[in-house]
């Protein structure tokens, strides 16, 4: 590829970004943009999957059937978020298995908040209310990110995270009564 051709592609790419036109999987994109998206989205996917673990441990110990059903739905949602995000990474040419292998080997990262134990039911409510609440604050902006599949996925994910936050808050209010 000639240098002028590359410069023209970069110019067109930047024009799309400047006009807030979403970049789609088949569009040309700079290698650094692609690499950054793969790293960011895979880290997000890993965080969704690892984030299920503390709550998943509480499904059989939830205080009542309603709380168990809500927690089961939440864990299922988080798994879906992770799978959706792994699919978004695949649209960038990354291999899902290699991405997961990077997580298992420690090469890839995830949100460190999930390294803390959830030893009481109040911890589960707090994860829902505060951790998911913080995630919403960070993720709402991603609904407007430049990469189309990620932006569209984030709209769905943020709606579900809002449900998780409400359930966490309700769980803690119930404990306080």
Regions found by a protein language model. Give the residues of each.
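Extreme N-terminal leader/anchor segments
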Residues: 1-29
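Conserved alpha-helical segments that form or flank metal/cofactor-binding pockets of metalloenzymes
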Residues: 2-13, 69, 74-102, 168-176
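Internal, conserved structured core segments that host functional sites
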Residues: 112-167
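Acidic/His metal-coordination segments adjacent to aromatic residues that form catalytic metal sites
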Residues: 22-42, 102-128, 145
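Alpha-helical scaffold segments that form or flank carboxylate-/histidine-based iron centers
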Residues: 33-44, 62-81, 124, 149-161
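Helix-loop segments that flank and shape redox-cofactor active sites
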Residues: 27-33, 51-73, 134-151
């Amino acid at each position: 590829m000639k240098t002028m051709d590359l410069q023209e592609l970069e110019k067109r790419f930047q024009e799309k970004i400047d006009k807030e036109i979403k970049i789609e999987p088949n569009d040309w994109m700079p290698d650094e943009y692609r690499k950054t998206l793969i790293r960011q989205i895979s880290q997000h996917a890993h965080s969704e999957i690892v984030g299920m673990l503390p709550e998943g441990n509480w499904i059989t110990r939830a205080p009542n059937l309603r709380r168990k059903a809500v927690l089961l739905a939440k864990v299922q949602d988080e798994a879906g978020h992770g799978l959706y995000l792994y699919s978004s990474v695949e649209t960038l040419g990354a291999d899902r298995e290699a991405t997961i292998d990077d997580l298992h080997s420690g090469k890839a990262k995830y949100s460190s908040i999930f390294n803390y134990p959830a030893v009481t039911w109040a911890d589960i409510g707090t994860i829902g209310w505060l951790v998911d609440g913080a995630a919403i604050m960070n993720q709402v902006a991603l609904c407007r990110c430049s990469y189309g599949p990620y932006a569209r996925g984030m709209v769905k994910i943020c709606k579900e995270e809002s449900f998780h936050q409400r359930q966490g808050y309700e769980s803690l209010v119930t404990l306080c009564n």
